[in-house]
Amino acid sequence: MEIKYDISIIVPVYNRENLIKPCINSINAQTLDKSRWEVIFVDDASTDRSIEVIEELIDKNINYKIIKREVPSGNASAPRNEGIKASLGKYVFFLDSDDYIDSKLLENGINIALKNDSDIVYFKMELNARTVTKRPFKHPIVDKADIEKNHLMRTLRIFKMFKTKMLRENNILFDVTVNVCEDMLFGATALLYAKNISILADRDYYFASLHDEPHLSKKKMTLEKLFHIYFYTIQSLYCSNRDINFKIKFYNALLIRCVEHLRDICKKDKINNENLIRIFSFASDLFNLHKEMFELKQIYENERL
């Protein structure tokens, strides 16, 4: 497909007439020349005035289009996939319709991406006035990040810039059968194929909000779904053509992420000791499928079991 812009912002929308204004205002405020980017709103069969509100608020000097789905998908995966397929940008950036971004995100993001030929650009993120994760964002700017040293596996949310060519050549799309943590699976898969990764943490760039309104991505995580994601990612890693050193780094970073993820879920759900043993035994069996990639020195002391 023709590349016409530097960046395509992809915004899935579902019944957001009362919440989308900050999102659109932040899009209107972007400092990057408007001729260099586009916005793709993908409406998932909203039943309110979301589309009308977009048309009312969006700066008409911005290149934008609205894709209207006839049947609701129930999650953000299908709308995001439609956005990827319709993109005319060298990079795509995912923005949820109830979140908003810093005015410099596109400008600073494309500058570091073009400078380093980045496949992914990470942005420091804030959730309800608190930074979501800190380790990947210790340094203000990282041109060439390392999956281990820069803790890239610790933030798999998809609010990043991804090179469109990388996504299309490797058929990286959101799995529409996964209705929870679909961004985690997408992020891990993209990380598997990315050769150059950059980080921007000189300011908060992405602002996520939590509220009680219906949300395309808001589903309860279950252990079964979580293990499905990790199993798929491990198998994809094993079958990839990446060199063994990268595979070892990726595998052990994923292992750490899995242990932390399970620990947080078990703590939140107050899992009893008997079930704790069963859950972590299952996780051990899962990663033992390719235990030849295990590297103890890559595991932090407090994460070792």
PLM regions and their residue ranges:
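C-terminal subregions of glycosyltransferases and related glycan-biosynthesis enzymes
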Residues: 209-305
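Nucleotide-sugar donor-binding/catalytic module of glycosyltransferases
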Residues: 1-232, 239-241, 245, 260, ...
